[in-house]
From Swiss-Prot:
Biased composition range(s): Basic and acidic residues: 392-403
Family: Belongs to the SNF7 family.
A Pfam family that the UniProt record links to this protein: WHD_CHMP7
Gene3D superfamilies to which the protein is assigned, alphabetical: 6.10.250.1710, ESAT-6-like
Known role: ESCRT-III-like protein required to recruit the ESCRT-III complex to the nuclear envelope (NE) during late anaphase. Together with SPAST, the ESCRT-III complex promotes NE sealing and mitotic spindle disassembly during late anaphase. Recruited to the reforming NE during anaphase by LEMD2. Plays a role in the endosomal sorting pathway.
Keyword Glycosyltransferase: no
Protein name: Charged multivesicular body protein 7
Residue numbers carrying Phosphoserine: 232, 410, 417, 431, 441
Keywords: Coiled coil, Cytoplasm, Nucleus, Phosphoprotein, Protein transport, Transport
Amino acid sequence: MWSPEREAEAPAGGDPAGLLPPEWEEDEERMSFLFSAFKRSREVNSTDWDSKMGFWAPLVLSHSRRQGVVRLRLRDLQEAFQRKGSVPLGLATVLQDLLRRGELQRESDFMASVDSSWISWGVGVFLLKPLKWTLSNMLGDNKVPAEEVLVAVELLKEKAEEVYRLYQNSPLSSHPVVALSELSTLCANSCPDERTFYLVLLQLQKEKRVTVLEQNGEKIVKFARGPRAKVSPVNDVDVGVYQLMQSEQLLSRKVESLSQEAERCKEEARRACRAGKKQLALRSLKAKQRTEKRIEALHAKLDTVQGILDRIYASQTDQMVFNAYQAGVGALKLSMKDVTVEKAESLVDQIQELCDTQDEVSQTLAGGVTNGLDFDSEELEKELDILLQDTTKEPLDLPDNPRNRHFTNSVPNPRISDAELEAELEKLSLSEGGLVPSSKSPKRQLEPTLKPL
């Protein structure tokens, strides 16, 4: 359990290894400057002031985040940032500036901003404010005492979000109401001490994500159903369900204890039989049977309680589904407010008419301008075929004039144009050797072949 004496012995800071910048060990001149005190006013030398503040303020917050703490004290920071036996002389000014900017907040001020009556009688340390702190605040002294606890606002919000996710992912989230002691056990690793745990609950309470109530001397916590939902006050249904859950746990523990007792009686009867003590063995067996009957009765009660809880959980699920359906119907009605079948049909007809008009315009534009000339497509196709046939014909080699003057009908009659005849005559006239007498007369060779009669 936490106590002020134990907390005073253990610093909240610790070793800041791994967080220190390179100049911490390499630049003696700069570190001497950073460890020196601030001037009385920033106006004296704003450059030096901003340089020191830009170094220490992020380092203090990052050190706290690395250590997983949300509560700071000047004394702990001075011990954590010692260097070669020297402590930073300007840390108090740094904390004052962080307080002014709202990144830090006095623990007492934070508690005053939230309804913390549920812990005022349980954790009295929150009400212990030394007289010198109260007097300094009344007199307007902004100096930070070495023992005063400050809260890192952003780190506390992050820790509260972590605890909320931890609860949501645990079996405790089956019902929004949970015992404070069970929640404290669940958050033991996230919250290093009891004061941090209570500060986290206060932050969640400030965000309206939890509410705390004392019931029969025991504190219970109710969580909001969703991450963005607001928690509702604890009602009779919540208390009834919580009592049923406590009864279930109590009956389960009792059944487990009686089961162990029945097993013990069975072992005693076995040992008595081995020792020949028949009467003792019979008494042990009778005790075992009585215990088993009690277990059966407790099982019946436990089944009843669990059945009621199952029905409650089912009804809560049904209520959630009903609310979702109701919200969906409302949204659908709102979205279909101005939509009717007649309007939909009219809209479709307009779209079809516009599409038809667009098709007609496209066809008209695709027709082009003919300049008043109409062409027959079939005649154009025939003429194109004739041109293709002429271009695909290869030139034929003329055969030698046969010696036999009797020609058959199978010999083709080649057609020779006038231009070809003129070219052939020109070649003959320019020949050097002239014509060789032969039975093949060029003139006859060039003449069209006649069919014999």
